[in-house]
Amino acid sequence: MSTASERVRPVVGTMIGDPAGIGPEVAVRALADGAVHTDSIPVLVGSAAAVERALDFTGTKARLRVMRGFEKPSDDPAIIDVIDTGALPDGVLPLGEDTEAAGHATAQWLDELDALARDGSFAATIMGPISTGSLKLAKKLDRVISPTPGESYLVLLTGPLRVAHLTDHMSLRQVIDVISADLVATAVGQLHEAMQSWGIAQPRIAVAGLNPHAMGDEDRLEIAPGIEAARARGIDVEGPIAPDSVFRHCIEGRYDMVLAMFHDQGHIAVKTWGFSGNSVIIMGPPYLHMSVAHGTAYDIVGTGKADAAMMLSAMRTCGRLASGRGFEQA
């Protein structure tokens, strides 16, 4: 088995999230875990002053190296590299509240993250917890990637359960209208290609049915033909499978990924199985892009209570997938 020093570890860029929230705190706490450096070479993007404040809040011992643009990152776990583009010229902001300044800074950091991934400086990226309130004040909400059927998808990961969502924030009535054979076949194909790039040579995909026991018109007339079209391309995909059992099959190792039809179908399964260490993949950009599965937690920022489990999970998973080593076996 190769060691971390023998492997080529990917450089992963993590945007710290809204500077008034717990994002900087969970980032530095996660980086203090040596496992992150086993999987990747991490670089933060955001306010160096906010990161410095987070080190004080959490009691984390590390030295900051501040960069104004991308430079060769340090390989020393005791050093935290931060790319600070000067989006917050006055340093830090008040804690626990939405501000226009925080929204502008968040948007600029997201743009920097995207640019560095597209030019190859970052092999993959992670978005810390953002505030849509701050982004709305700055009129920058468009910087956040919203899952769009046929174009981008939300994938939730928790232990052995991995769930992609055909649709996201959409009413059940709209879901019924949107589901089509072409949409299902497209999503299955995109999942297959993504998982191969993550190191899963022969992905096994299960497609959940829409109706109880997968016995409705939508299952028969749209979902099943979409699965057949994907299977005709050589993809290992099964379904539609009854929604009340398909997630258990994934947990037991029969499948590598489940494609859920709508938001709550997938989210309920994931959050019932596990919550603390969940992470999120946002499929859509031409690179691996992940996020944490929690918000800014304004009510506990600065108290030292912020739990870094989800950020740690995102950083470790991102490193594994970006280097083509697949999902960690649960």
UniProtKB/Swiss-Prot annotation:
The record's subcellular locations are: Cytoplasm
Which SUPFAM superfamilies does the protein's record reference?
Answer: Isocitrate/Isopropylmalate dehydrogenase-like
Report the record's Gene Ontology biological process terms. Answer: pyridoxine biosynthetic process
Q: Give the catalytic activity.
A: 4-(phosphooxy)-L-threonine + NAD(+) = 3-amino-2-oxopropyl phosphate + CO2 + NADH
The note on cofactor binding and number reads: Binds 1 divalent metal cation per subunit. Can use ions such as Zn(2+), Mg(2+) or Co(2+).
Name the pathway it acts in: Cofactor biosynthesis; pyridoxine 5'-phosphate biosynthesis; pyridoxine 5'-phosphate from D-erythrose 4-phosphate: step 4/5
EC main class here is oxidoreductase
Q: Give the highest taxon in the source lineage.
A: Bacteria
Is Iron-sulfur a UniProt keyword of this protein?
no
**EC number per UniProt:** 1.1.1.262
The coenzyme or cofactor needed here is: Zn(2+); Mg(2+); Co(2+)
Classify the main location: cytoplasm
Q: Which residues are listed for a divalent metal cation binding in this entry?
A: 169, 213, 263
Q: Which UniProt keywords apply?
A: Cobalt, Cytoplasm, Magnesium, Metal-binding, NAD, NADP, Oxidoreductase, Plasmid, Pyridoxine biosynthesis, Zinc
Provide the Gene Ontology terms for cellular component. cytoplasm
User: In Gene Ontology terms, what is one molecular function of this protein?
Assistant: metal ion binding
The record's listing under PANTHER family reads:
4-HYDROXYTHREONINE-4-PHOSPHATE DEHYDROGENASE, D-THREONATE 4-PHOSPHATE DEHYDROGENASE
> Anything else of interest in the record?
The active site is located at the dimer interface.
**Into which family does the record put it?**
Belongs to the PdxA family.
Q: What does this protein do?
A: Catalyzes the NAD(P)-dependent oxidation of 4-(phosphooxy)-L-threonine (HTP) into 2-amino-3-oxo-4-(phosphooxy)butyric acid which spontaneously decarboxylates to form 3-amino-2-oxopropyl phosphate (AHAP).
Q: Indicate the quaternary assembly.
A: Homodimer.
In Swiss-Prot or TrEMBL terms, this protein is called Putative 4-hydroxythreonine-4-phosphate dehydrogenase
Species whose genome carries this gene: Novosphingobium aromaticivorans
